């Protein structure tokens, strides 16, 4: 089995199959077109440039294409890149499966679904419980498969469910410490806050934004979904309004994508939990790629900072 692409060190040669995660056209300083390819396997992804790209290359090397590459790992402007020597699409005879290149959550789907179901079962408010159960059941297949984002955090198969399970465990610990919090409301907010991403995003492979995702966004999508669920379940109570507020405010500020700031205690905590879990995932993934005594690449979503791995962290 080939070494994972993220396990290669600078200076090593790569000769293996990879999946094109994304392909972006650019124009070099000499006026010639090139493609920026994000190539992935189950260990992560790496950027590569295809210089002097022909128009036909945009089709040949489109996202979701499996390719055989030969190249060298090197550093360029603080980032690890793959310098291509050769690249070609695979043939059917090579019998390579796209699933073999997809990074997945570290917890099996059935275990994550069991955890989410248990948190719903523990809810005591019937209105909150019914709405949450209804929406999870409606979108269960996508909920268990989709990533939480196209980049930055939990951007892998089942990343959305993994993000939610981690947040639920954080929510439980915080609610144990602060008993004045409404557990039902907080748990429901965690489970539903990003569920609109099953319509905002295209799916778990070469994830991009749908038309609905670009024009509306997952927050607006989920507020509408909540309203429809309440109507179908004939629930007309303040719980619906408060759940909608938790969805609307979970990004915290207008400049971060929330139409309203948190104005309910559980909404404030939801925002912190979401932010904490996303940032922990970003840091963990960046630090996995370096040895003790080294700095990570700059993490754009964390104010473009680098993080140091202490020498005593093996």
Swiss-Prot record:
Residues 163-279 form the HD domain. This is 3'-5' exoribonuclease YhaM. GO terms for biological process: rRNA 3'-end processing. NCBIfam families: PRK13480.1. SMART domains: HDc (SM00471). Shows a 3'-5' exoribonuclease activity as well as single-stranded DNA 3'-5'exonuclease activity. Plays a role in the secondary pathway of 23S rRNA 3' end maturation. The lineage of its organism: Bacteria, Bacillati, Bacillota, Bacilli, Bacillales. The keyword Transcription regulation does not apply. Induction: By mitomycin C and UV irradiation which requires RecA; probably a member of the yhaONM operon. It is an enzyme of class 3 (hydrolase). Its EC number is 3.1.-.-. One of its GO terms (molecular function) is DNA binding. Residues 22-90 bind DNA. Disruption phenotype: Non-essential, it can be disrupted. Correct processing of the 3' end of 23S rRNA no longer occurs in the absence of mrnC. The keyword Nuclease applies. Keywords: Cobalt, DNA-binding, Exonuclease, Hydrolase, Manganese, Nuclease, rRNA processing.
């Amino acid at each position: 089995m080939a070494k994972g692409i993220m396990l290669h060190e600078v200076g090593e040669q790569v000769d293996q199959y990879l999946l094109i995660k994304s392909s972006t056209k650019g124009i070099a300083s000499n006026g010639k077109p090139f493609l920026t390819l994000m190539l992935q396997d189950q260990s992560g992804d790496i950027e590569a440039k295809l210089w002097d790209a022909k128009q036909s290359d945009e089709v040949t090397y489109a996202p979701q294409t499996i390719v055989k590459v030969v190249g060298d790992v090197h550093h360029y402007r603080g980032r690890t890149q793959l310098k291509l020597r050769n690249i070609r699409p695979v043939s059917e005879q090579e019998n390579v499966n796209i699933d073999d290149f997809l990074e997945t959550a570290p917890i099996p789907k059935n275990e994550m679904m069991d955890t989410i179901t248990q948190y719903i079962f523990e809810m005591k408010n019937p209105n909150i419980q019914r709405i949450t159960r209804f929406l999870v059941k409606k979108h269960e297949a996508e909920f268990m498969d989709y990533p939480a984002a196209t980049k930055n955090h939990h951007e892998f198969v089942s990343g959305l469910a993994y993000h939610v399970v981690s947040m639920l465990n954080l929510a439980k610990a915080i609610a144990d410490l602060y008993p004045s919090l409404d557990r039902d409301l907080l748990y429901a907010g965690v489970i539903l806050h990003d569920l609109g991403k099953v319509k905002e995003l295209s799916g778990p492979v070469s994830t991009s934004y749908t038309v609905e995702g670009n024009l509306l966004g997952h927050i607006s999508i989920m507020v509408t979904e909540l309203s429809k669920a309440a109507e179908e379940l004939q629930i007309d109570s303040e719980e619906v309004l408060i759940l909608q507020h938790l969805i609307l405010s979970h990004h915290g500020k207008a400049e971060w994508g929330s139409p309203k700031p948190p104005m309910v205690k559980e909404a404030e905590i939801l925002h912190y939990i979401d932010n904490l879990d996303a940032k922990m995932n970003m840091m963990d993934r960046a630090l996995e790629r370096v040895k003790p005594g080294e700095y990570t690449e700059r993490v754009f979503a964390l104010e473009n900072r680098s993080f140091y791995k202490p020498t005593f962290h093996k």
